[in-house]
Structures are given as structure tokens and as C-alpha cells.
Amino acid sequence: MFEKCEAIVIRAIDYGETNKIVTFFTREWGKVATMARGAKKPSSRLSAVTQPFTHGYYLIQRSRGVGVLHQGDIIDSMRTIREDIFTAAYASYIVEMTDKVTEEQQRNPYLFELLLQTLQYMNEGLDLEILACIYEMKMLSVMGIPPKLDHCAVCGRTEGKFSFSIKEAGFLCHRCEKTDPYRIPLSAASVRLLRLFYYIDLSRLGTISVKEETKKELRAVLSSYYDEYSGLSLKTKRFLMQIDELKKIGYPYQNQTENGSGG
């Protein structure tokens, strides 16, 4: 029996000469893998609807293993993401993370909305680094590894100058900073943004302008925290680091790509 769902394409890999195995993250059922027969053919009605990051309505026959994709109707192709190598790199990173931390057919409407809203913001041209930071912060609770952000992880105080301790999994106030010689120094702006990114309703996100120095502090905290606690090894993370290096040396921002998160 075919069932209708709202879904985002998070992975598409070639299977044989003409087919694809397409993994969706659906609003109704969570992650679902399907066989899209003939989708590699440019003339196929499944070709456009199985492009990475596409948001649409789909008719799917589910099974315990790989289901069958019957048809799809595009709501938003997210074409702007796929047409820019930097945007595609960031989008690929968040969909791979979503793929790695979720199990098949475990419904999570919150995560669906988080993924959809983030991709829409990326498609609209909002700050990619900030969107990635927000997504990383919010995924910490999904993975069950939330940091201590409301108070000092050692003494519980809520006021003072804070740094971040990977060892203590949260903020350290200036009175307790000597408990971790490897703590990461933070500006007041970084402390505020880490809290904001963790708690903010993403649908209410406005324009956020963040200094490069602050972004470096945020990246230092999140990269170290993920390395220590997440257990994730993401190919797209390594590619993202290479892309950021290209950006720093002035690589042309607009570049055509259709690779997205496929493969």
C-alpha cells in the first residue's frame, strides 16, 4: 500500500544503471529508505523529485527494509543550495548529521521542522556558519549530550565571566576556571550566542550579524564538544573545512554543483 508523506531528500545513491536508493526524512515516520526505479534517467518523473535537499510530498510503499517510491510533488526544490558549492557543503553537512544520528522509521516532528527550517534559511542566503552552529547546538539535545549552559558546571553560579570546559561539558565561571587548564576562553558575546542558539525557536530567527572572532570561538567550542561526546565521523565535515579554506583565499563564491549530499 502506498502512503503519502511530507519529506526531505537527505541521501540519494545510484543503484544499477538507472535506479537510485533515496533516503527521506519524513514528517510522519522519520527516516525512510526507498528504491526509486528509473530515477537516474533525466526523462524520469522521479529524477527531479529525488534531488538532494528537495522538500516535497511523496507516495511511498514502506517495508522493513528498503521501500518503493511511486511518485513525488515538489514543494521546494532548494535549487539555490545545489547551485552554490559553499551552500551545498553546509547543507550536506547538516543532512549527513541528521542521517547519522537517526534510526529508520522513528518519528521526530521536531527534528523534521528543524531540518526543514535550516535548509530553507540556507536556500534564502542566511549566514551559513551561524545556521550550522545553531543546528549543531540543537542536535546536542537530540543526541542526548546537552551541555551545561545555564550555570557554572562546577559551582552552579549563574553570574560572572565564563569560559567553556569540554571536560565538565559546560561553562566554567571565573572562580572555577582553574579546574580545567584546557578550558576555551569565551567573550561575553559567545556565551550569549551559545545559549541563544540552544534555546531559540528557529522559526523566529531574525538577521544575526556575528564577528569573525566570535565565530571562531563558537567553532572551537562546538568542534571540540562534538569530537569528545558525539562519536560522529562525518565526511562532509572534512569537506566543509576544505571549503572554508577556499573561501578564505577568495575562491569564487558562485559555483555550479549538483552533487549535494548524494553518495
Swiss-Prot record:
The keyword Lipoprotein does not apply. InterPro entries: ARFGAP/RecO (IPR037278), DNA_rep/recomb_RecO_N (IPR022572), NA-bd_OB-fold (IPR012340), RecO (IPR003717), RecO_C (IPR042242). One of its GO terms (cellular component) is bacterial nucleoid. Keywords: DNA damage, DNA recombination, DNA repair. SUPFAM superfamilies: ArfGap/RecO-like zinc finger (SSF57863), Nucleic acid-binding proteins (SSF50249). GO terms for biological process: DNA recombination; double-strand break repair. Pfam families: RecO_C (PF02565), RecO_N (PF11967). Involved in DNA repair and RecF pathway recombination. Belongs to the RecO family. PANTHER family: DNA REPAIR PROTEIN RECO. This is DNA repair protein RecO. It comes from Geobacillus sp. (strain WCH70). The lineage of its organism: Bacteria, Bacillati, Bacillota, Bacilli, Bacillales. The gene is recO.
